[in-house]
Amino acid sequence: MEWDSDSEGSGDEEEEEEEEEEEGVEVGGGGDGGVGVGVGGGFALAIEGVLGACGLVVSDALEPDFPIIYVNRGFEDATGYRAEEVLGRNCRFLQCRGPFAKRRHPLVDTTVVTDIRRCLEEGTVFQGDLLNFRKDGSPFMAKLQLTPIYGDDETITHYMGMQFFNDSNVDLGPLSVSTTKEIVRSTLITPDNTIRPSPMGKGFCSEHSDLFLLSDEVLCQKILSRLSPRDIASVNSVCKRLYHLTRNDDLWRMVCQNAWGSEATQVLETVAGTRSLAWGRLARELTTLEAVTWRKLTVGGAVEPSRCNFSACAAGNRVVLFGGEGVNMQPMNDTFVLDLNASKPEWRHINVRSAPPGRWGHTLSCLNGSRLVLFGGCGRQGLLNDVFMLDLDAQQPTWREIPGLAPPVPRSWHSSCTLDGTKLVVSGGCADSGVLLSDTYLLDVTMERPVWREIPASWTPPCRLGHSLSVYDGRKILMFGGLAKSGPLRLRSNDVFTLDLSENKPCWRCITGSGMPGASNPAGVGPPPRLDHVAVSLPGGRILIFGGSVAGLHSASKLYLLDPTEEKPTWRILNVPGRPPRFAWGHSTCVVGGTKAIVLGGQTGEEWTLTELHELSLMFPTLNQKDLELYSWKL
């Protein structure tokens, strides 16, 4: 938080302040726990001044950049700014002359600004005389005191600023405003407080609304950032002002974060090239899916010995492979990593400590960043229900067993996903003697003594294996497909079920299912029943389905899209250019950064060629800066 400042203190001023001490009050740090008010002191203020032209500003010290959360009427009257124009902004805008200026005025004393910053960093009181500017550009001197406000835990939670205003005799000349922004503001305010555009405002906002009285910052941070990407794309065609505002990349990042969640945007930022990619372009391509295409890649290294039925997942931009079924059904326990950020990606065997027992038919999931979690599968001694964690970025990567209490029964070919970067969710699978399961368990691996918790539900989907679990909309889970029990039979399924774990009593809901009594099928052509397919969670909640085992086919290549957040979910088919893989299985495909799916290998008989990859990319290759400047939103 920075305030306009101009330090011109002198001995005469000190004498004047001493004379005022006898009849004034001082607002200062009142010791532990908050603000105190005392009589006298070096910053004495006349009682008449307190009751008169006193500006009061409160800023939130716990938020980045100390945003203003309150201003009083005295501040509004003295500065010409209305509360809605300044809330959410940093106080440094008072250093700029006029509402559209972007830089501190050269007459502002930077040494005083530095002193203010020092006081804020140290949590001490600041007192001084500052040069500020009204909304109309006229200067005034303000006697200012900034006082920290403490919470119950001795943490500074807010800063209170008290200002007393005096006109300044500085001759600054007329206020210059850029032509574009002058036209934006060239409106006449009618008696009923609405806006009537003037003739020179032709082509700009002509709505009779107080909305356009708001500053650009308030419009972006409080209104536009809360819209969906599609809504922002529509808003930018309303007028030139909104068009220019919606070309701001910082606004697009806020829009994406609000629409997709902070976790999704953080994952996107870890992907190579995303930081140099315009968020507006990213929002468009992940919303319209116009850039989806297949690419075939060849990488170096090798995964030896050869195997199948392994499990793979992505940690950032790295693909991690663990275990699998070797020759003669030999369970394997080695770990391989493929770094897609490398100039020449190649498979690399990782020497890890305390490797888990070998297995196949297990699940490997990424919790967050570089931490992986492994569960279940079939080992040398039979089915497993153990949990192991691995931190890829540790100096010496080590598989660490998580001894969870009350674990689910051992299983393989189950499905799992992670929540909040801390919790593992496990559902279904195959138990001893080929019994199919329908239970759902949750484990918080960050607890000192983790305890498995079965999700209670009055009704559960039919028992199944080879299905998929996808997280969307925060803490909601979507289950699709699998080999499900139907009476005495086991049939491939294309059922869709959802579970909201944020509810007090979570319950499964059937969205669609050909085998469910009374279940309604959504509009559009749905995917054929399948198991061991690929499910890709897209930012915004949509789910992409392809591949797997389909009756009469080895692996279906069509892509199906479903948005479970819609009032009436509708299946859509995506026509994707490029050459798709011949095979795509859920256990050997992983989603990297929310922008691409990597399908590992081709298959000839029982041999896997893991140096051949197929990438389903959701974005166009990165454009140069000139192309980015020309890139525009039109949905």
Swiss-Prot record:
What is the name of the protein in this document? Putative adagio-like protein 2
What role does it play? Answer: Component of an E3 ubiquitin ligase complex that plays a central role in blue light-dependent circadian cycles. Acts as a blue light photoreceptor, due to the presence of FMN, that mediates light-regulated protein degradation of critical clock components by targeting them to the proteasome complex.
- List the top taxonomic levels of the source: Eukaryota, Viridiplantae, Streptophyta, Embryophyta, Tracheophyta
Regions of compositional bias (Acidic residues) in chain numbering: 1-25
Task: State the organism named in the record.
Answer: Oryza sativa subsp. japonica
The pathway noted for it is: Protein modification; protein ubiquitination
Note down the stretches annotated as region Disordered. 1-32
Biological process annotations from GO: circadian rhythm; protein ubiquitination; response to blue light
Q: What region holds the F-box domain?
A: 209-255
Q: Which family does it belong to?
A: Belongs to the ADAGIO family.
